[in-house]
Amino acid sequence: MKKFFIAALLMIFANCACAEEIPENGEGGAASAPANINHVDSIYFAQTNFYELTSGNGRIVLTHYPPALQTTEYSCGPIAALTVLRWFGNNDFDEKTLIRDLKTDTKTGTTLSNMSKFFRELGWEVHDTFDTPHFDDIADFQKFVMKNLSEGTPIMVENVEYGGHWRVIVGCDTMGTENLYDDVLIFEDPYDTSDHKSDGFAVGSLDRFFSMWFDRNDLPENKHEQPWLTARPK
């Protein structure tokens, strides 16, 4: 829910054949970022086509995962949910209807409890922070991530980025080593404006994400750490 208002220019995803503009609920958010924030020849960020990326050599990725960018400053949760719905072939929702159905607040965003409730009411199988033991270390977390991805299940996560931000883990790469500290997470990021390629995908260190995986507003005080959920049709 980053307060980052930019002059309206809808993003053109020239570098990702699948990436979809979603101007369904206004002209804000990452979808309104100017095209000149993208740099095909960036020396700082690799211009990987994550949509076409495949698994292998220690990497598990959900190939052809459908990316999307939020069109408001507060709808990262609805967009994360939207991509999960589309991954499993449900095209009955859009950003606007999910903002309503998830009871998204324009100031504080979307709660984990409302995300889980929405998918349960669809009749989907849902697991989340509230029904699962705390991950004690990154080894447990990495095993959890790899297991879900190997089963074709994306993982919706929220952490303190931007003061509170929903993303979806759609890939993990061990880099072919036993050392967990070089592992990379691949995210579907509804506010993907920071890597010179606004295609809806971003990468980050598994270790660094794990160390910053806590919430400022969403969860009860004794449940601030490790907000996540998985949802898939039964």
What are these regions (language model features)?
Residues 22-49, 172-234:
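Noncatalytic regulatory segments and standalone regulatory/sensor domains
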Residues 18-112, 182, 231-234:
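Active-site-adjacent structural segments surrounding the nucleophilic cysteine of cysteine proteases
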Residues 75, 79-83, 97, 110, ...:
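Extracytoplasmic/secreted proteins, especially bacterial periplasmic and envelope-associated proteins
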